[in-house]
């Protein structure tokens, strides 16, 4: 019924994950937005996910490790009772969309590959309101949380520079 469709849409969120190629190089960015009106719980999830992204970006400096980024992201979301997906991670990016190193949204400070000036990476927290367990849908592409609770996803492409992280996909 129309009422059921409206109820489904009213508190829904949707992630838009886009990749573009320019002059042979890839850029990758994602944002999760409400579909129409959303409730306070979803609004908080969206806010915390974006803030966790920027906590991770602050760690994207030469000499730090991918573990520093992941630790910053996970440490940011945990006090809210949220979790991060472990099956999907950020990544290096350049001529190919997915390059080394992998950038998990969890980790131990000082562990994993060291970041070097000139690297370009994608940091992309995928934050769940509940558990991090996921189910891949029959189409082989769609993914939902096993507990049915909402998840949000934000991403930016970041250049590692001597002057700090440079966000290459910053939106106005």
What label would you give each PLM region?
Residues 13, 19, 125-126, 163:
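Short, surface-exposed secondary-structure boundary micro-motifs
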Residues 1-9:
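Single conserved hydrophobic/aromatic residue that forms the stacking wall/gate
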Residues 21-27, 38-114, 120-132:
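Conserved, well-structured core segments that form or line functional sites
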Residues 27-43, 134-149:
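Short, compositionally biased
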Residues 156:
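Acidic-aromatic/histidine active-site loop/patch
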Residues 170-172:
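The conserved catalytic core of RNA pseudouridine synthases
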Residues 10-12, 118:
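Loop/turn positions that initiate beta-strands
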């Amino acid at each position: 019924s129309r009422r059921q469709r409206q109820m489904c849409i009213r508190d829904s969120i949707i992630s838009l994950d886009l990749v573009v190629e320019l002059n042979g190089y890839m850029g990758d960015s994602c944002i999760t937005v409400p579909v129409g009106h959303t409730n306070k719980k979803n609004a908080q999830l969206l806010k915390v996910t974006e803030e966790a992204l920027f906590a991770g970006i602050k760690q994207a400096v030469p000499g730090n490790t991918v573990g520093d980024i992941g630790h910053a992201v996970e440490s940011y979301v945990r006090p809210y009772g949220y979790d991060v997906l472990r099956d999907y991670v950020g990544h290096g990016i350049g001529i190919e969309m997915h390059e080394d190193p992998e950038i998990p949204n969890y980790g131990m400070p000082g562990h994993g590959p060291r970041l070097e000036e000139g690297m370009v990476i994608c940091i992309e927290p995928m934050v769940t309101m509940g558990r991090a367990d996921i189910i891949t849908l029959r189409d082989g592409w769609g993914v939902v949380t096993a507990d049915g609770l909402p998840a949000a996803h934000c991403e930016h492409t970041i250049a590692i520079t001597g002057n700090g992280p440079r966000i290459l996909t910053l939106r106005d």
